[in-house]
């Protein structure tokens, strides 16, 4: 069957491997959503291979995969850590207390040996506020560090900036090599 929508589906599974969550994202536009009946406790994640358990947390699956790509570009094994998408963060309303997202609470329940949480939420006010609230609320359970992207609004923006810089460097090298002939 030929699909006309060009979307990607990020599937989250419970500890038994049963699909319980699915986020949909357009490859050619801004469309994003969740499949009806999705349970946010089981948002998209990638488990580390072995070693001490640490998790890197992102607002979206795209940011988690961008982080994996950045690690690979740096020569590191992205599978040496776990990656968890929250499937977005709830908007804070005036006077409302920000809570720990269900996906992270479930992940910590399923991984009681987790010894570190790295929060790579968006570098905007809602992302920074959520990161502070989450770090504060999980502190009694596990250390959490707030690590927004060094450039751009989110990890995917940072990846694009890194790739653009690498391309500029390659172009400059090609020009320099041509001039040296």
Model-found features: residue ranges?
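Short active-site oxyanion
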Residues: 51-56, 116-117
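Basic, glycine-enriched DNA-binding surface that flanks or lies within the catalytic cores of DNA
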Residues: 1-49
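Conserved Rossmann-like nucleotide-cofactor binding loop
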Residues: 63
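Conserved phosphate-coordination/catalytic loops
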Residues: 35-36, 58, 95-99
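Short pre-functional
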Residues: 9-10, 55-58
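TOPRIM fold recognition
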Residues: 69-181
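Helix N-cap/beta->alpha junction signal
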Residues: 59-60, 123
């Amino acid at each position: 069957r030929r699909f006309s929508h060009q979307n990607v589906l990020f599937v989250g599974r419970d500890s038994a491997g049963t699909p319980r969550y699915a986020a949909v994202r357009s490859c050619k536009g801004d469309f994003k959503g969740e499949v009806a009946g999705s349970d946010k406790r089981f948002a998209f994640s990638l488990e580390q291979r072995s070693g001490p358990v640490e998790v890197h947390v992102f607002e979206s699956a795209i940011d988690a995969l961008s982080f994996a790509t950045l690690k690979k570009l740096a020569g590191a094994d992205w599978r040496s850590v776990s990656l968890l998408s929250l499937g977005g963060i709830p908007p804070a309303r005036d006077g409302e207390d920000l809570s720990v997202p269900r996906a992270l609470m479930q992940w910590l329940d399923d991984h009681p040996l987790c010894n570190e949480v790295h929060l790579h939420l968006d570098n905007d006010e809602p992302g920074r506020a959520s990161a502070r609230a989450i770090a504060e609320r999980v502190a009694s359970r596990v250390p959490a560090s707030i690590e927004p992207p060094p450039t751009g609004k989110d990890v995917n923006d940072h990846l694009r900036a890194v790739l653009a810089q690498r391309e500029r460097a390659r172009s400059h090298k090609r020009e320099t090599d041509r001039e040296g002939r």
